[in-house]
Design a protein with these regions (language model features):
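N-terminal helicase ATP-binding lobe
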Residues: 1-707
Length: 707
């Protein structure tokens, strides 16, 4: 950018400041930084001054700063757990200051705001005893664990799985379904954090049960918390509600990057179908961009369609890393795995169904500046599952899954993935469909009857109205009449019951009271002969699987050998039954969560109500870890694929079948053995195994801090 142009831009920004248009001035500064990135300018001092005026202190070029600018850069530095203090921007500092004063906050801020810096700084400065962080997905739980582990694992036990024992100081990072297991473990917690708390509203969460369980967790943990800190993007107003009562709502419309959009849909030719338009223009656009790009496809079917298009249109990458990855996928999953064909073309997939380690590996490859994945095809999982940012976002669809057109709030969340502090000052958005009309987002956290029924009568954590009290009394009376007061009191305190929908719980209780032998021949689930499982599972699986019951049943028989047989053999067996490699992932997820949860609830009810009932916990434990050893399954969340765990087990390095160990015990064993010795113990390892193992070790490594 020419020197004279820089001066003119600075003058324009200064005029905006004089008029009090601070947000416009901030956007102008960010655009200027984008245009001058990597350039040496005689106007650095002037640019620094403007950066300071708009509160973007981390962007100050400290080497050549005036004393005023240098002072601001240093004054806003805080301890975030890194080796050196980091500079916050003005809005981050405002939020952190309020938290350090003991306030409870509900904060709405853009995706690029840097909310994690505030959490890290609070922990580093305040050193709370117990921190509970609720996140919407397991993928986000591991991403958060990796960040906090490297900073704070020397002082805190970082917990992301159920069954873990608490230490003196703990940081729990959990999706709400796992949080129920720990509610009664605390009399008090120092700070309770909910990321993406808008998902407690059924307006924004597709699954009502998930919204209800999040509200229940917010009520239960919120009552035990000295402080609460709830986070969401793009909320304009928070309606008064019992779940955020006593919290200050802070709407921080503070941009650290600028988003610029282009209406690609206007290039659609007359008479051209949308599919033909995408087929013509998308490959062209990706070739033009040649930089990190998220493609929002909206649904699984659309991802399949776009995958086939790109496989046919894009050339094979010259990257050895990507070619190794593609070969690794074919070897460890299936030669027919479409992701392998995409990977060798520099394309990845994020759909919320893949093995967690596999999703992590793709995000890691996407973060590579050279030789990695440049494009990720995604559903809405990319906006709720991870914090990945890109330079470009391409919007191919304006629907969320198979539903009708999404709203402006969802649209803003998707395009908010464009741009990243320090790397992409300007995020570019390419619209293949017309976006929704601009609208302010009002967040209303209703208090559903199902949530009222799930809360404790004496200590609900939130205030009930008269109708809710009457409803709860009626429900309790019905349950006590059905099974007796003692049985009901024993059941309702169990975490598995507290996490369940009250209506589902009641329905299962009624079924078992009417037929104490239900599900028929359930004791057969403890046998090794999978044929014997057919009768009891045929009665349980339809409860959650509906029309997909057949495929779930087939998957259970095949997956029962998950630890015994190689994954390609499991997938080949499923393909013989017309179940695809892509379905393999979603079915395994459904079995390990939905089937395990329903069976655990049935088992708890039977053990309480049916005298002499057989405990099905051994089978439920196997199902909940997809028939892998529990530790091997949990290590996948940490980024270690089952294929490597199996090889390490066969080499005699680890005993993953020792159920007395916690995941933290195994992690300690990995740390003690070290990367080099573990890699050396894997005979004939694949070149990409090294990349995967390094990524895993990065997630269990600490920062060496200066004393």
């Amino acid at each position: 950018m020419a020197t004279i142009d820089i001066f003119e831009k600075c003058s324009e920004i200064n005029d905006l400041l004089d008029k009090g248009l601070i947000e416009d001035a901030r956007s102008g500064v960010i655009k200027l930084l984008h245009l001058t990135k990597g350039q040496v300018s005689p106007y650095e001092e002037l640019v620094n001054h403007l950066i300071r005026e708009v509160g973007l202190y981390p962007y100050i070029i400290s080497e050549n700063a005036s004393w005023e600018d240098a002072f601001a850069y240093e004054a806003f530095k805080v301890n975030t757990g890194e080796k050196e203090s980091q500079t916050l921007h003005l809005a981050q500092s405002e939020v952190l200051t309020a938290l350090l004063k003991g306030e409870s906050l509900a904060v709405s801020a853009p995706t690029s705001f840097g909310k994690s810096f505030v959490i890290d700084a609070f922990i580093a400065i305040k050193e709370p005893q117990n921190v509970v962080i609720i996140v919407p997905t397991i993928a986000l739980a591991d991403e958060t664990r990796r960040r906090l582990f490297r900073k704070f694992s020397d002082k805190y036990k970082i917990i992301t799985t159920t069954g873990a024992n608490l230490a003196q100081k703990n940081i729990l990072i959990l999706p709400q379904e796992r949080a129920f297991a720990f509610i009664d473990s605390f009399d008090e917690i120092d700070i309770f954090i909910v990321d993406e708390f808008y998902k407690a509203s059924t307006t924004f969460e597709r699954e009502n049960d998930r919204a209800n369980s999040l509200l229940t967790v917010m009520a239960r943990f919120g009552a035990k918390a000295k402080q609460r800190y709830y986070l969401a993007p793009n909320i304009h107003n928070l309606e008064p509600n019992v779940f955020t009562e006593g919290m200050r709502f802070m709407r921080m419309d503070f941009k650290t990057v600028v988003t610029m959009s282009r209406n690609e849909y206007k290039k659609k030719e007359e008479g051209e179908s949308q599919d033909d338009f995408v087929a013509r223009r998308l490959p062209e656009l990706l070739e033009e961009l040649k930089s990190k790009t998220l493609v929002y496809a909206g649904s699984y079917n659309k991802i399949d369609q776009v995958s086939d298009l790109l496989i046919g249109k894009l050339g094979i990458s010259q990257s050895q890393l990507l070619n190794d990855f593609a070969d690794w996928l074919r070897k460890n999953y299936s030669k027919k795995f479409r992701l392998a064909d995409l990977a060798e073309r520099g394309v990845g997939v994020h759909n919320g169904s893949l093995h967690r380690s596999l999703a992590q590996i793709q995000i890691k490859l996407f973060e590579e500046t050279k030789g990695g994945i440049d494009t990720i095809l995604s559903t809405s999982s990319i906006i709720e599952g991870v914090n990945t940012q890109a330079e470009n976002v391409i919007l191919l669809s304006n629907t969320n899954g198979s539903r009708s057109m999404f709203d402006y709030f969802t649209y803003r969340n998707i395009i908010g993935r464009a741009g990243r502090m320090f790397r992409y000052f300007v995020g570019r958005v390419f619209l293949f469909v017309k976006p929704p009309d601009k609208a302010d987002t009002q967040l209303n956290l209703d208090f559903p009857d199902e949530v009222a029924l799930s809360l404790d009568t004496e200590q609900p954590g939130v205030e009930f109205n008269k109708d809710q009290k009457d409803l709860q009394r009626k429900y309790h009376a019905e349950m006590e009449q059905l099974i007796g007061e003692e049985h009901y009191n024993n059941l309702k305190v169990l975490p598995i019951v507290q996490a369940a929908s009250p209506s589902l719980f009641k329905e299962l209780v009624e079924t078992i009271v009417e037929n104490p032998d239900w599900p028929l021949n359930h004791v057969a689930l403890l046998r090794n002969n999978t044929y014997d499982w057919r009768e009891p599972l045929s009665e349980v699986i339809p409860i959650f699987a509906g029309n997909n019951t057949r495929n779930v049943q087939i998957a259970v028989w095949r997956l029962s050998n998950n630890w015994i047989y190689p994954t390609p053999l499991i997938i080949a067996g499923l393909e013989q039954s017309k179940v695809s490699v892509d379905d393999f992932f979603s079915l395994e997820r459904s079995i390990s969560f939905n089937l395990a949860t329903i069976l655990a609830l049935i088992n708890a009810i039977r053990l309480e109500l049916v005298e002499g009932s057989v405990d099905l916990t051994p089978f439920i434990s196997r199902v909940s870890s997809a028939f892998l050893p529990k530790l091997a399954y949990q290590l996948e969340e940490y980024g270690l694929p089952r294929m490597l765990s199996k090889q390490l087990s066969q080499a005699g390095l680890f005993d993953f079948e020792d159920d007395t160990k916690e995941i933290t015990d195994i992690v300690s064993e990995f740390q003690q053995k070290g990367y080099a010795s573990i890699l050396a113990a894997i005979p004939n390892h694949h070149p990409f195994d090294e990349y995967v193992l390094k990524h895993f070790f990065e997630g269990i490594s600490r920062i060496e801090k200066h004393i």
